[in-house]
């Protein structure tokens, strides 16, 4: 299952639900605006 915002993530954007990206700086999923 994908991770929602503020869940910790370690790898790529694939971890985060659609529309979110893994912020390597902060270490969690964040909303991404294209």
UniProtKB/Swiss-Prot annotation:
One of its GO terms (cellular component) is extracellular region. The keyword Transmembrane helix does not apply. It is found in: Secreted. Disulfide bonds join 2-17, 9-22, 16-29. The keyword Disulfide bond applies. Keywords: Disulfide bond, Ion channel impairing toxin, Knottin, Secreted, Toxin. Expressed by the venom gland. Pfam families: Toxin_12. Its main location: secreted. One of its GO terms (molecular function) is toxin activity. The presence of a 'disulfide through disulfide knot' structurally defines this protein as a knottin. Probable ion channel inhibitor. Belongs to the neurotoxin 10 (Hwtx-1) family. 50 (Jztz-F7) subfamily. This is Jingzhaotoxin F7-10.36.
